[in-house]
Amino acid sequence: IALTIDSKFVRYCAVTIVSILENNDPKDIMLHIVSGHLPKEDVLTLSQVAEKYGTSIAFYYIPHEKLQNYEVKWQKQRLSMVVFYRCVLASILPSTISRVIYLDSDTLVLGSLKELWDTNLNQLALAGVQDTVSPNPSYFERLQYAPSYNYINGGVLLLNLAYWRKHNIEQQCIKYYQQYPDRIILNDQD
């Protein structure tokens, strides 16, 4: 399971981790925390939470330069770069990891993640759940795609990292972001 955070979200992430491990078998869970930088005390806090359940966390750090292609929108809205870390998971996580569940670090997991994990991606880049605002026609008009594609919640995803790597999805995200910045209002959600 991959979570992306900065120091402001450590306490929320700790709650997310507890909710994951309380509702799933900890021995089946490997946690991947991706951040720009975390102070040692934050790393220790999250590690101690995981250790209480007999699991561990791998920490990955993304250099600021890796995400410079996205910065125009961040600067306009003063958002943290963390919102785009999920777009680069395929190049950050080890190549031996072919799929990963991505969760926003303020997600409360109330049940098993097994059904999501077992989802057959059939050569798809990702699977997600329909967002509650999906019926809003303006989203589809702005993004210029058919409503039949649905609008998914970007905070709970099953990512096919092997597909992302093979088809250069990370670069496609960057290219789309650079070509159509005015279409992307909800940032990583779009």
What do the predicted segments below correspond to?
Residues V43-S47, S95, L110-N122, E170:
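Short alpha-helix within the catalytic core of nucleotide-sugar-dependent glycosyltransferases
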Residues V10-N24:
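Histidine-anchored nucleotide/phosphate-binding helix
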Residues I1-L3, I20, M30-I33:
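Hydrophobic targeting segments
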Residues I29-H37, G128-V129:
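Short internal beta-strands
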Residues A127-P135, Y149-D190:
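Catalytic core and acceptor-binding pocket of nucleotide-sugar-dependent glycosyltransferases
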Residues V100:
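Short aromatic/hydrophobic "clamp" motif used to bind/position activated sugar donors
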Residues L44-S91:
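Active-site-proximal specificity loops/subdomain of glycosyltransferases
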Residues T107-R142:
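Conserved donor-nucleotide/metal-binding helix-loop-beta segment in metal-dependent transferases, i.e.
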